[in-house]
């Protein structure tokens, strides 16, 4: 509303009982003239992973060029075997050089979300009155031994990011908001416990992005389309 309000009065009407057959995540935009008569309308759907689609054509409303020539893991694996290169090197071959600056920003955002989540306490926004628990689990896990500690810390890191998402904090969709804690938790733990360099983390993110893109191209990363495992399973 803040974006459109300067041009004309804006009202958002929620209709939770209306089910749109094309996709559950839909929004109808209606424009009215000064007399309140409808002048135009547009229905668009958020189909997951940042993609928008219209019911008539089902295609993305934003046309973006293909970055990767190969769209299956089999093709990419064969390329890696043929060239002796890794998955992240395939990403390097296809992307522009600024991809590494972008992934650096992604990594910084992930780390910040973990740290904020571990430091924050209190009740999460919403009617359920759920308390944040990441900091408690982190303290508990720190007292465990060996493998139990490792698993406990990863869980605490993932929960920290998920709680940041639930409170409206800045997170990275990996590949979605619903699964935003898994990838940063694993990478954060690897850097803390195994001293992985930022370079190795960025290569891991490039690989993760490649795999996520393959799934999005051939199946779905949308929980609304394919259930929660489309999000968490891909992560």
List the model feature ranges, each with a label:
Residues 1-12, 203-235:
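A structural-propensity feature for long, helix-poor, extended segments
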Residues 2-153:
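C-terminal regulatory domains involved in ligand/effector binding and gene-expression control
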Residues 53-55, 173, 183-186, 228, ...:
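Basic, gly/Ser/Thr/Pro-rich low-complexity segments located predominantly at protein N termini
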Residues 80, 94, 177-180, 228:
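Generic recognition of cysteine residues
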Residues 97, 101, 105-224:
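Accessory "access/gating" subregions that flank catalytic or transport cores
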């Amino acid at each position: 509303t803040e974006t459109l309000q300067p041009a004309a009065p804006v009202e958002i009407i929620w209709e939770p009982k209306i089910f749109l057959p094309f996709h559950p995540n839909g929004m109808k935009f209606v424009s009215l003239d000064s007399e309140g008569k409808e002048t135009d309308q547009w229905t668009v759907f958020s189909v997951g992973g940042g993609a928008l689609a219209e019911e008539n054509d089902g295609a993305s409303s934003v046309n973006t060029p293909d970055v990767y020539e190969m769209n299956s893991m089999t093709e990419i694996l064969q390329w890696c075997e043929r060239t002796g290169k890794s998955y992240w090197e395939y990403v390097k071959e296809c992307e522009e050089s600024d991809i590494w600056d972008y992934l650096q920003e992604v990594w910084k955002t992930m780390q910040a979300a973990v740290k904020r989540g571990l430091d924050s306490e209190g009740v999460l926004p919403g009617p359920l009155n759920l308390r944040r628990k990441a900091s408690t689990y982190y303290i508990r896990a720190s007292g465990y031994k060996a493998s139990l500690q490792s698993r406990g810390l990863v869980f605490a890191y993932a929960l920290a990011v998920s709680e940041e998402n639930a409170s409206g904090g800045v997170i990275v969709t990996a590949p979605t908001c619903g699964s935003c804690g898994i990838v940063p938790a694993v990478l954060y733990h690897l850097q803390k416990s195994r001293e992985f360099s930022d370079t190795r983390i960025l290569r891991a993110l490039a690989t993760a992005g490649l795999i996520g893109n393959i799934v999005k191209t051939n199946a779905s990363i949308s929980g609304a389309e394919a259930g929660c495992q489309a999000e968490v399973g891909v992560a």
